[in-house]
Amino acid sequence: WCSTCLDLACGASRECYDPCFKAFGRAHGKCMNNKCRCYT
């Protein structure tokens, strides 16, 4: 687990962009192990 990961199931990195933007203010991240990891 990491501080910039979201407990959100994903199948593609683009599915993480909007949740990452809502959570951290940057629409940038990737799908790792079916979870979203956001870059901040």
UniProtKB/Swiss-Prot annotation:
Cystine pairs: 2-5, 10-31, 16-36, 20-38
Site (Basic residue of the functional dyad): 30
Location of the protein in the cell: Secreted
Keywords: Calcium-activated potassium channel impairing toxin, Disulfide bond, Ion channel impairing toxin, Neurotoxin, Potassium channel impairing toxin, Secreted, Toxin
GO molecular function, one term: toxin activity
Gene3D superfamilies, per database record: Knottin, scorpion toxin-like
Tissues expressed in: Expressed by the venom gland.
Residues with site note (Aromatic residue of the functional dyad): 39
A cellular component term, taken from the record's GO annotations: extracellular region
Record-linked Pfam families: Toxin_2
Primary location recorded for the protein, binned into one broad class: secreted
First and last residue of the signal peptide: none
Domain observations: Has the structural arrangement of an alpha-helix connected to antiparallel beta-sheets by disulfide bonds (CS-alpha/beta).
Role noted for this protein: Inhibits high conductance calcium-activated potassium channels. Reversibly inhibits Shaker B potassium channels.
Misc note: The N-terminal C2-C5 disulfide bridge unique to this toxin does not appear to confer stability to the protein.
Family as reported in the entry's similarity comment: Belongs to the short scorpion toxin superfamily. Potassium channel inhibitor family. Alpha-KTx 12 subfamily.
The protein's name: Potassium channel toxin alpha-KTx 12.2
Source organism (scientific name): Tityus trivittatus
Taxonomic lineage from the root: Eukaryota, Metazoa, Ecdysozoa, Arthropoda, Chelicerata
